[in-house]
């Protein structure tokens, strides 16, 4: 957490994509690695190759591969702000300077900014391997339609006779409403600290209510045993 200070701890900073959709042609971290005080620079290539599967990540089920690609972009940046590289240095100022020395070559791809545009048949596809799942009601895995699209899941829920309801209604109002992204706005400064001991055990301090979800995701993405990971929840404000 933000209040945790350990002897000799390193500080991390993240380089993020300025583009909403772009192919990553190359990442050169050599200058950043050579900067005095920088201890490590990581990209997606430093992650182990993992067998993709669906896991329960505390509040929802998700693809392990897609979770890993969200942590650090693999072949493409999928949204503006997508993490591209991470720097660990002896202080935050050096880490920030190191970010400026990382050279990323992008091929900018077409992008859309609304859900309606993203669901059109001719929309640019973000996940090349994503196919739409169809299911009736919200539970169960559903059936794979085999259709490559930006729609992860099409859930059909039917209750009663809607046409009969329209006929019997005194007034029918049809409108479409959209809002901006809303966050619950917790008040504590969010941070995560980790210590990987020489005996192979990893301890993580973070502001979370889902310690087992954090442990499971870390285990799956880093390909280490859950028994070697300990997650300690910190103060949560808000």
Residue spans for each PLM region:
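Structural alpha/beta core scaffold segments of enzyme domains
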Residues: 1-238
């Amino acid at each position: 957490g933000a209040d945790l200070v350990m002897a000799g701890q390193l500080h991390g900073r993240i380089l993020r994509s300025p583009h909403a959709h772009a192919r990553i042609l190359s990442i050169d971290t050599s200058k950043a690695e050579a900067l005095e005080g920088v201890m490590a620079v990581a990209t997606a290539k430093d992650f182990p190759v993992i067998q993709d599967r669906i896991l329960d990540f505390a509040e929802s089920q998700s693809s392990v591969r897609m979770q890993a690609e969200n942590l650090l972009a693999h072949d493409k940046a999928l949204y503006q702000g997508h993490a591209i590289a991470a720097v660990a240095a002896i202080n935050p100022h050096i880490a920030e300077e190191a970010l400026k020395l990382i050279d990323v070559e992008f091929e900018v791809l077409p992008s859309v900014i609304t859900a309606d545009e993203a669901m059109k048949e001719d929309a640019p596809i973000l996940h090349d391997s994503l196919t739409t799942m169809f299911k009736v009601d919200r539970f169960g895995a559903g059936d794979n339609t085999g259709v490559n699209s930006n729609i992860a899941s099409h859930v059909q829920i039917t209750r009663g006779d809607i046409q009969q309801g329209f006929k019997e209604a005194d007034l029918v109002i049809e409108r479409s409403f959209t809002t901006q992204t809303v966050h619950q706005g917790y008040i504590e400064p969010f941070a995560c600290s980790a210590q990987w001991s020489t005996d192979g055990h990893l301890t993580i301090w973070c502001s979370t209510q889902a310690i087992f979800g954090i442990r499971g995701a870390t285990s799956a993405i880093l390909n280490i045993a859950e028994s070697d990971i300990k997650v300690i929840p910190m103060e949560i404000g808000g």
